[in-house]
From Swiss-Prot:
Annotated residues for binding of Zn(2+): H78, H82
Residues annotated as domain SprT-like: 19-164
UniProt GO MF annotations: zinc ion binding
Protein name as catalogued: Protein SprT
Length: 166
């Protein structure tokens, strides 16, 4: 799928959100943490990721185009919180008490771990598999591992090995 070209107005709104959240955090923490790099190259179903070592936030441009306000209000602060926690506390669990504190007490945003965005536009092709109790959809990566004989997948409900449907 071709990555959409993000209008400059959306990029500016995202940058404003990032800078506002960072300024709030720096004020409350009494620090002067630098501005992270923003990259619009996140793929798949993740809305965004925080890359600690390179101190950058990667955002999914497809989901951003479809959920602009939620990205500005929630996703940007969520990823920024990961970077700030890493700078402030070092390596800690990604959605642990430090991250929750950073989100709620410092950034003033509800600490939600996952998004609820519609994913049809970014969901990869899947392959139908079956067990005793239900149908499953495997990603192309998992399907190829089964085809090459590298692995078998089991249903968590009934324990059956999944078999490709024709």
């Amino acid at each position: 799928m071709k990555t959409p070209r993000l209008p400059i107005a959306i990029q500016q709104a995202v940058m404003r959100s990032l800078r506002d959240a960072l300024a709030r955090a720096n004020l409350k923490l009494g620090r002067n943490y630098p501005e992270p790099k923003l990259v619009y190259q996140q793929r798949g179903t993740a809305a965004g990721t925080a890359w600690l070592e390179s101190y950058e936030i990667r955002l999914n441009p497809v989901l951003l185009m479809e959920n602009q306000q939620a990205f500005i209000d929630e996703v940007v602060p969520h990823e920024l919180a990961h970077l700030l926690v890493w700078k402030h506390f070092g390596r800690v669990p990604p959605h642990g008490k430090e991250w929750k504190w950073m989100m709620e007490s410092v950034l003033g945003v509800p600490a939600r771990r996952t998004h609820q965005f519609e994913l049809d536009s970014v969901r990869a092709n899947t392959f139908p598999y079956r067990c005793r109790c239900q149908q499953h959809q495997l990603t192309i990566r998992r399907h190829n591992r089964v085809v090459r004989g590298e692995t078998q997948y089991r249903c968590v409900r009934c324990g059956d090995t999944l078999v490709a449907e024709n």
